């Protein structure tokens, strides 16, 4: 379910990041009235996308799992897990939008703090739900959704208390087709960019699922390890979204150029370093997701992560340029 999960949640993360671009732009230009209008319309669009995505994904999950040849011995567990995750899309979008708003105004620390709290809470709830209450796949998904809800609601309360400049008047809070069109022109392409590769992963999953549950387990573990190593590169791109938007709004194009080249350099250095480290520690990294005694699955996971990251680390350093 990794590809399907990333397809939807990657889109959610992307649209939230895209919605923040006009807000960053107007903040950099010190046009606070327009910034509040974009913020208000971001809220209306987020509610719309949360409702539509939740209904569509929950309704279609089982059909997609069948279409991708999910093995019969795990399809029910996969269905329960992914449906529960998708039922929590409103909370996922809430955290992504509120954290994007804080980053748009130059605060990248608080989103991290709320995410750390959610991560530790998720670990604790996993132990409680799976080990103590034996809730299985549903328990793991439920723990994730609750953690996202805590992070999202915490971020929202923080914004309401500490960012009075985002509080819009009745006039500024009215739905505006012009502002929504601008937000969608940024958010939807960003959402597709963050999820488009997952479409290929979903199609590939259909072929992988036909090879049996051992190969599925290997591909899932390898995919988690690969995603773990790619997160810093994606974060550089997300940071460049805010950085470039604020400086474009302030009309400081030289600073944008310097930021892009700096981000590209950081991405290249990280890609080379992480790939070299991976060659030494791949078994240890995959061991975080697999039992070391499952040698056949471990070998297949090592093969997957090697070829996966060999290709990704060639293209991924250019992500900051394409996003910014």
Name every feature range the model reports, one short phrase each:
Residues 144, 155-197:
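Interhelical loop/hinge segments that connect adjacent transmembrane helices in multipass membrane
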Residues 1-55, 92-111, 218-282, 315, ...:
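Small-residue-rich hydrophobic transmembrane alpha-helices
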Residues 1, 65-72, 128-135, 195-224, ...:
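Helix-terminus/linker motif at the lipid-water interface of multi-pass membrane proteins
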Residues 72-95, 227, 233, 295-315:
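Alpha-helical transmembrane segments of multi-pass membrane proteins
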Residues 119-153, 283-287, 296:
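Membrane-interface helix-loop junctions in multi-pass transport and translocation proteins
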């Amino acid at each position: 379910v990794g590809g399907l999960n990333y397809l939807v949640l990657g889109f959610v993360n992307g649209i939230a990041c895209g919605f923040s671009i006009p807000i960053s732009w107007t903040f950099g230009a010190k046009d606070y009235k327009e910034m509040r209008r974009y913020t208000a319309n971001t809220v209306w669009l987020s509610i719309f996308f949360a409702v539509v995505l939740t209904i569509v994904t929950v309704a279609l999950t089982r059909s997609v799992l069948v279409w991708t040849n999910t093995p019969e011995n795990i399809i029910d567990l996969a269905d329960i897990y992914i449906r529960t995750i998708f039922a929590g899309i409103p909370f996922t979008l809430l955290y992504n939008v509120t954290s994007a708003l804080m980053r748009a105004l130059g605060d990248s620390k608080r989103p991290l703090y709320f995410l750390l709290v959610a991560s530790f809470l998720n670990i604790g709830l996993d132990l409680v739900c799976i080990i103590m209450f034996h809730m299985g796949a549903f328990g793991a998904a439920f723990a994730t959704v609750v953690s996202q809800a805590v992070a999202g609601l915490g971020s929202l309360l923080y914004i309401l208390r500490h960012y009075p400049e985002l509080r819009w008047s009745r006039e500024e809070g009215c739905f505006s087709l012009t502002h929504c069109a601008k937000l969608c022109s940024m958010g939807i392409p960003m959402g597709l960019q963050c999820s488009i590769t997952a479409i290929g992963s979903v199609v590939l999953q259909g072929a992988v699922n036909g090879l049996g549950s051992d190969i599925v387990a290997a591909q899932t573990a390898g995919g988690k390890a690969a995603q773990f190593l790619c997160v810093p590169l994606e974060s550089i791109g997300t940071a460049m979204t805010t950085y470039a938007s604020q400086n474009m709004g302030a009309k400081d194009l030289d600073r944008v150029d310097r930021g892009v080249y700096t981000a590209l350099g950081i991405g290249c250095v990280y890609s080379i370093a992480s790939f070299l480290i991976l060659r030494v520690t791949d078994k240890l990294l995959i061991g975080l997701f697999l039992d070391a005694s499952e040698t056949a699955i471990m070998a297949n996971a090592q093969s997957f992560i090697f070829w996966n990251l060999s290709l990704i680390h060639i293209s991924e350093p250019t992500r900051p340029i394409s996003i910014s």
